C-alpha cells in the first residue's frame, strides 16, 4: 500500500511540474498600448512624409528655375535626391507588403 501512495504522490508532483512548465512556456500576449499608432496610421504618415518631401523638392526646383534669390543649386539637388530616395524606399516597402500578402494568400488553410 505504501508503494501505491508514493506512486500517486509522485504522479501528482509530476503533473504539477508539467502544468507549471506549460504555464511558463506560453508566450505572453503583447497588447497594443492605448494611444500607440496602428500600422495603417504609421504607413499613412510615411506616405504623407514622402509626399511632403517631393513637394519641397518641386518648390525648390521651381524657385531655382525662376531665379529667385536664396535658392542654391546644391539645395535643389539635395532636395531632389532626398525625394528620390524616399520614393524608392516607399516603393520597396510597398513591394514587400504586396509580396507578403501574396505569400499569405497562397498558404494552405
From Swiss-Prot:
Gene Ontology molecular function terms on file: cytoskeletal motor activity; structural molecule activity
GO biological process: bacterial-type flagellum-dependent cell motility
UniProt cross-references to Pfam families, sorted A to Z: FliE
One CC-aspect GO term: bacterial-type flagellum basal body
Domain of life assignment: Bacteria
Subcellular location: Bacterial flagellum basal body
Coiled-coil ranges per UniProt: none
Keywords: Bacterial flagellum
InterPro entries per record: FliE
Family to which this protein belongs: Belongs to the FliE family.
NCBIfam families reported in the protein's UniProt record: fliE (TIGR00205)
The name this protein goes by in its record: Flagellar hook-basal body complex protein FliE
Organism per entry: Stutzerimonas stutzeri (strain A1501)
Gene designation per UniProt: fliE
